[in-house]
Curated annotation (Swiss-Prot):
Acidic residues biased stretches: 111-127
Name by which UniProt lists this protein: Histone H2A-like 3
Domain of life per record: Eukaryota
Stretch forming the signal peptide: none
Disordered: region residues: 101-128
One of the GO biological process terms: heterochromatin formation
Length: 148
């Protein structure tokens, strides 16, 4: 029995859900988001994989059309205007812009108290100071704190 040693196989490297499905989109992240949203009581193991595949297909399709739009306009960098123009030209993808318009119309601003409005005004003033003063921001903030 002394000659019988346990044979250990080398462990295979773990593969992520995305890699197993040969997708670029993060399947595990989508699964976590779906579980946290609690829209459904039970979630199939293939649901996030399918959703990642659909999102990847849509993204690739949109980027292909946007790339053609950028090439036609003789530019090197993709801007939001290029994306919007490409979506407007494609009849099948135009619904994405309609979704965007619906979400903007449904969003309403929350009523704010006077304190929250003052805090927001201070933040806006600080942003102006940041833009104007550039690298001297820290010194300026310290002086204000000492004075008050």
């Amino acid at each position: 029995m002394a000659g019988n040693k346990m044979f250990c196989r080398p462990r295979r490297q773990r593969l992520s859900h995305s890699r197993r499905a040969e997708l670029q989109f993060p399947v595990s992240h989508l699964e976590r988001c779906l579980r946290e949203s609690q829209h459904a009581r039970h979630l199939s193991s293939t649901t996030p994989v399918f959703l990642a595949g659909v999102l990847e297909y849509l993204t690739a399709n949109i980027l292909e059309k946007v790339g053609k739009e950028v090439k036609n306009s003789c530019r090197l960098c993709i801007t939001p205007e290029h994306v919007k123009r490409a979506l407007q030209k494609d009849e099948q993808l135009r619904w994405i812009l309609e979704l965007e318009d619906d979400t903007h119309s449904q969003v309403e601003e929350m009523p704010q108290s006077e304190e929250e409005e003052e805090e927001e005004e201070e933040k806006e003033e600080e942003m102006v100071v940041l833009v104007v003063m550039g690298g001297r921001r820290r010194r300026r903030r310290r002086r204000r704190r000492k004075d008050s």
